Amino acid sequence: MNKSLLTLSLIPIASVMHTYGTNHVPDNRPNIILFLVDDMGWQDTSLPFWTQRTMYNERYETPNMEKLAQQGMMFTQAYASSISSPTRCSLMTGCNASRHRVTNWTLRKNTKTDAVSNTLEVPDWNYNGIAQVHGTNNTFIATSFVQLLKDNGYHTIHCGKAHWGAIDTPGESPYHFGFETNIAGHAAGGPATYLSERNYGYDEAGNSTSLFSVPGLEKYWRTGTFMTEALTQEALKALDKAKKYNQPFYLYMSHYAIHVPIDKDVRFYDKYKKKGLSDKEAAYASLIEGMDKSLGDIMDWLEKNGEADNTIVIFMSDNGGYATGSGWRDEPLYTQNFPLKCGKGSAYEGGIREPMIVRWPSTVQPGT
């Protein structure tokens, strides 16, 4: 992950830890929400992260991102690694990918995920991910900042995608990193499906049909609840519970959206079809707006519960926008982040530039 971005994203957390570690402990330590979107490009929003609006800004509708930006600071040149696991491991450990050496996405234990090449020899890397304990080869060992928050009195909640470690390693479980609540997080880096009609990847007997089946959402099976909404509802319930503990909370709201498969979120799909978008692009846009609704629901919870002025909200994506698969995006490919080149998985700027917003009332100047 870009060093300056990582430093900026962790400044609020470091400040919190420093304050709590003194003898004069305030009663109002801030809550922290990291709202991380999967595969969201820098233009996949109605909020322009440039000097001018683009055609993609005109296409999508993300009013809650706009609201968050009005209340906080936009980072118009924010960067991540070009793919999921490296960014997520950097956020968890504070280490650049060149240091933790999780340089591609993780899934199966002791198995690399690199493409086969006749011209390049890929160096050995930590394909088992990260962990807090020794004992697994090709693993980077570090204490997560979540563990530090928990040890210093924060209630810690994980909701959504994890993707820090391979299957059957300590790093596959959010509980291993200090989370007290885990909603739907496991080793896989994407969902089998967002559709409750398909039980998010489970058969009727409750058996997983894929390594990408999303666990822990059984109550929503066959209810017509799109997974983005199911995760949001579970996060809100976890916040209701956290409110009773009389301690600050850390919520890692880590959506699977807008990772493939680009399933239609029927709450928003028809709107984009009426705009003239193709089936693929309307489905993609519906995923984006569903994510934005989730952001709005969480911001509404903060307002209704009197926590808005005492909560840091950090909005990010884990890499550049998806632009490489004709099964999910319209051709010509590699143009979806234009004028930047390429997209997710590429070291070109289209693969590493992402939207970022930070809101911290009374500390970060609004509208900057």
PLM regions with names:
Residues 7-15:
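Bacterial N-terminal signal peptides
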Residues 2, 9, 20-368:
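Formylglycine-dependent sulfatase
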